[in-house]
Amino acid sequence: MKELEYPFDSGYLLKKKRSIKRLLLSDGSVRIKKKIAVLGGSTTNDIINMLELFLLNYGIEPTFYESEYNRYWQDAVFGNEELDSFSPDLIFVHTSNRNILKYPAITDSKEQTDALFAEQMKYFETMWEKIAERYHCPVIQNNFEQPYFRLMGNRDAFDCRGRVNFINRLNTAFADYAASHESFYINDINYVSACYGLDKWSEPSYWHLYKYAMCVPAIPDFAFNLAAIIKSVFGKNKKALVLDLDNTLWGGVVGDDGVDGIEIGQETHMGQVYAEFQKYLGLVKDTGVMLTVCSKNDEENALAGLNHPEGSLKPDDFIMIKANWDNKDRNIEAIAAGLNIGQDALVFLDDNPAERAIVSAQLPTVAVPEMERPEDYIRVVDRSRFFEITAFSSDDLKRNEMYKENAVRAAQQAQFTDYGEYLHSLEMVAVIDDFLPVYLSRITQLTNKSNQFNLTTKRFTTAEMEQVFADDSYIRLYGRLADKFGDNGIVSVVIGKVNGDTLDIDLWLMSCRVLKRDMEYAMLDNLCDRAKQRGLKTVKGYYYPTAKNKMVKELYGDFGFTKVSEDADGNTVWELSLSGYEPKNKYITVERNK
């Protein structure tokens, strides 16, 4: 919904929140359901109302537990029967500088301020440890906005007795805690309040009248930032940028002005703007976001523009380049198909409002931000939080290279008339083995991102995955696939629970990067072999349909399983006898971890 995309009208959202919610709930979208506990050190009702709108727009339907006013610490540390029975999927702790127990006094010594700092950190760490111990779910914790006043002026920043200094120390300690604890995230209200304007954010009347830790008009900005973290935790990030060229990556029209006539580089102020935007996009690419081009241009001109010596993005930085005179919505469909990702994983950037309108109308799940002034391009993309990072792995760093290698594989496939011969030619080698601690973060990340080849779409938090890893009643497999063109990284995960003489498959997923390579057969062979080694007789598989996983509806049937039941919603149960099972993998050499 456009009204909920950055930049939004906060006043309109606050006024129309009920009608917007009705529209979202009646739009026919399929959403994942999540339970979110909000433990507040100040009033949280309007925050929850606004957060709900942004999450619904992201494809998440939340239900909320809301603590009583300023009971956040007690609920977490001493327990709460209602919160326990709610069994949250995620906990958000909403505190602000109003919840700092005590600030240093101007008469305190360095030793006294250090002791006060340690006391404050112990207060929060005790709460976080109790939450982890009791609820085993992701936690989002606000850091602190800057104080409303500086008693010592600029000295507040470096004097140990200054409030600014004390808050900065706490924020650094909060960040260090998040860096060393999985599934713990910081909602950076220090940054959000600075962007909004600290004087407006900290308007005292909202606290004294209503116990709001921020002014009410700032709540949509706060909720939007928080929602970005939550949607990332639950696998709703975008994956790729689709970029126009003329007046988007450079100033001017390369086909009319020539390469020498476009604006990019240090010679003009607008050239500097476009050069800075290209550098920003390069940084985004380095985080694992895929870059593609969709431009109405002759390909020769497009490539010439991308090879401009003052530009930092070159043709090799893009996985796909669609430079032709076809309608852009058709090209974007082809890009999604070529990358093997959903259209809802794409963000389209174009300076032309007519092109944006056409793509929005024809491809409503593609994100199309308003790109009005080149000077604002970075801010619009960055503040839209399309690519919020809550987990980061070495595979993310290599994603663009992996997809480019896929393009080379596709080119080689075209040379073969026999698909089996093509698979043989790839010289594929897979490592399939039990989980390793070093891979748990990547495995958890995959469970929250893979949607197409995912039979149950069960999601796991890091804590839940660690429980599975420690439980001998599970058979766990990760699969890593490499071939002569490169290493695809960890691409498949299977988790099966032993029940008597049966293995129930709780989770089976595979990255779309390796579809149609027969990796699923290699995983199945390994799974059945391990099940037989444990004396099991039957493997039972489950398929739960979603809007995105229809491609695996008959996977178990293709494997030779027998369908034993199907309900009115299309949920199916399948069984395979291990007696006489014959291996199915023909093309992949399988190794165990060395």
Give the residues covered by each predicted segment.
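A conserved beta-strand-loop-helix scaffold within acyl/acetyltransferase catalytic domains
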Residues: V431-S511
